[in-house]
């Protein structure tokens, strides 16, 4: 988007340049057209950042600097006809900044006052410098080739979320920020903790992450400063290894870049749907302290945050930044919101609460009984599970961040980054509940009946996790002539210690019920008996990722559009996963929970990549990239990518990409899936027959009694993908841009869990037979059986308007439309159209911002389309059809942020969900809302105070 060549280049430096020709000083002769042409400037006084943006727009300059360099600084009015270089010098000197020229229209601003220069626009040229201008080294997501312009249109669509947009959003976590982006789907920690599905009562792996384009989190690669990070220490049965976004404090994030489309040729495995690159802050002048406090309009879900960071410049021109952050959030239970219930009668969908009491073997309720239940349940004996479940876990997070950038010798720099953090998180589930077969002879035994029972006397199921993260990187970089190089070593570690209270041990339950010690009729049970029945369950997970990388980049040969630039590098990695579940889980002695197995695995990998940028003319460029990866146990994988960019007219750019991608099986997937080992009756089919134990339940109704379990699959292969994007970017005038892109991603060999009951041909290893060939068991395992084909559109509109008296107005609108989402569960099956099911097929995010003097006000809106209830195969469920509730309606939420800044201070008020929208969801299994999309807090107020030192 061409307008960002000015506006975004100012708001954040994202550039590397390897200039070999001498660069003139500001105002020197031969500085190019920008220095020679005089411009009638009309720049009102006010914030220095706005004044510089206006100067860049009016003069056609490109200014590069850190955003914190201009924060709190003021500029005087400038209404004169001057050479652009002289005008820039005047603004910079008044603010105590130094200016260095890169070329005729590109300048770098840094701290400190340059030596006094003569006022005339043209000054004597100083001696030519011996090396390139010292511009900070940062890369654009989607390529290893440094770019000299943050706003240059790239072949792949890239969304940039700036620091100012992060602050105006009011989001306090990286997870909240990303899940609000169009085309992103959030995976909430409460949902992730449902280990194995909603029927499993073991809340595990409470990580928070997001995914792009409905392909799941394992197809989205998350990077921090361009490097991979370790996954969350515990693994999710449904989602596998996850990058925990909440482990990265939003206060230390400089910006976020989202590249959509395949990028395995650049970054290797996992980047099939896209890449999210989280860029951390590196430079700051002085100290900055921030205090925030927020609560819902109902006075609950409170959160508070304190952070402090301090940066300085070293004697040799380097930078040091250290920061500390503490975040506290209170738990929000479902009982605090009326809409969080399984009672859907208000929508005509019936009451789905669980009646507690005795049932006969035909499941008829004989009488209600809910001993030990609280008063609000005892009246009706109805268990409303969502009322007991956390809408928001309680959390306490502490983080420490440090950065050092230090020149060692002429042309060689040392960079050290360190990030450490701890997090205590607690979430609550309903009391453990099950259908109990009370043995004959027990005082509460009823003939020919079982008891639907909730263990209220044990208490709710609670999961507490203690997470510790450590990320460190040491890198050297430098220049040799026009060529740049870097070498980096990084270590990433995530450890989770989790404890679950409130579960029931199988053997202890059998013992106390056989002995008649535990009473179901309300007779108080001794605390010692309850403690023996429900022992705490602990587990530990460690995920470690170690990386070594070297790369070089520079000009190769001359082309009509400029020098061809190339980048090449080598990456080595070691991925380690250790999982130590509680012995009771290993022995499958926890009721209604999947059996867990210890994991102690590691995987090594290596990758070699090369990229080249070919500017065949000023209007036509081609990017080529290729990467070869070797993963231990899975051989070699080659991933190419091509990108094209053509500008037939000034301000109009057509672009396209084509790429392949892959994802090697994770260490989690090389193991058995989490399955509850149990006996089951399955219909006898020709594929299953003969069965060792057959039951005839009616005419032509033959069922096999089998043991359900799981196994590993040594023949697992990597998933593969092909993707392309086609689009255009239009910037007819400075200050306005628009882009529209179409994407398609086809993922094959998808790794999915399943068994012979899903498809016997797709899972041939699933059948377990005895020595006579009769079926005795069915094992589930991971196999390469799935396929997904997703197509859609993305757009982005941005505009900036300056007024003489009323300040600056900024408008942005971005959206995503999922035109097609087809899935095939097993080979040969019919493709099912999932677009609009489970999640909306359209989403949009926009804002209008006003800035004048020290004031800033932002009104933002997030809109989501409707969601179909049911499934593509089964359609709308009958109760929903009868009630006319086959589609959950879409919604729009409005937020408001206002801030005022004066020297060294900034105060802001953010109001989330101004209209206090009540969630609505007609999928009766979701308990009244969609945890991936809705914010259960409702209207939320957040007050922030910042002080610069």
Each language-model region and where it sits:
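N-terminal plug
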Residues: 30-31, 51-54, 62-66, 86-89, ...
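Non-catalytic regulatory/gating segments with a bias toward low-complexity or hydrophobic composition
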Residues: 166, 178, 256, 276-278, ...
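Short loop/turn motifs that connect adjacent beta-strands in outer-membrane beta-barrel proteins
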Residues: 283-286, 314-317, 408-412, 479-484, ...
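N-terminal export/assembly leaders
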Residues: 21-118
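Surface-exposed, low-complexity loop segments enriched in small/polar and acidic residues
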Residues: 237, 338-345, 364-395, 401, ...
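Outer-membrane beta-barrel translocator/receptor signature
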Residues: 187, 238-243, 251-254, 265-276, ...
